[in-house]
Amino acid sequence: HSIGEFWRRWHITLGTWMKDYVFYPFSLSKAMNKLGKFFKKHSKTRFGKYMAKALPICLADLLIFFIVGVWHGAAWKYIVYGMYNGIIMSFSSIMAPVYEKMFKITHINKNARWYRGWQIIRTFILVNISWYFDNAATLTDAFRLMGNTFKHASFSMDAVVKMFGSQLDLIILLAGCLVWLIISILKEKGIVIREALDRKPLIIRWAVYIALVMSVAMLGYISNTSGGFMYAQF
């Protein structure tokens, strides 16, 4: 539903390391503590007092995503990729009180399906914009790709299949996305998949186990023939 939630789920190991060794040490440092006290002392408004707490967190987010950008590669496109995400997260933290006030004025129900759907669409768009910087050859190419998205927009199924390698690769990808979507919906509803599977008949459980083993074997073969581990260079 947000860039922050996306990153918490996207790269859990990297996120945990950054949280333990960068975020907490930086945001709780003496310098950030002094900065927070300075804002709290000289701010007379409620928003100013909120900034005393939010600013160290925002600066820590910017530092983390700068490091994440450099971790992806020593190039400007990766630095912009990291800072893009960091700025969005920091801006969201700063504007949180303003958003809450807007919700009260407009009487928007944040738990309504339409609003949650809007959050998903918004996050999907923001994340896909960041991929321009991650996937382009250079920073200049990233901005050129953005412009061409709107200037030369077209759709070709043959081009989509070619991008993923083969029709089989595309089918496997779509099947995986469908399974992922179903699992995500079940988790959002509070259903523990393992517990639900344990309540099923033995034949269904074994069918699922065999399907999982075959999927791992098949995907492992595909991975070995498609260029290896994508993070091997980092």
Predicted regions located by residue number:
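Cytosol/matrix-facing ends of alpha-helical transmembrane segments
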Residues: H1-S2
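Non-catalytic, membrane-anchoring transmembrane segments at the edges
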Residues: E5-Q233
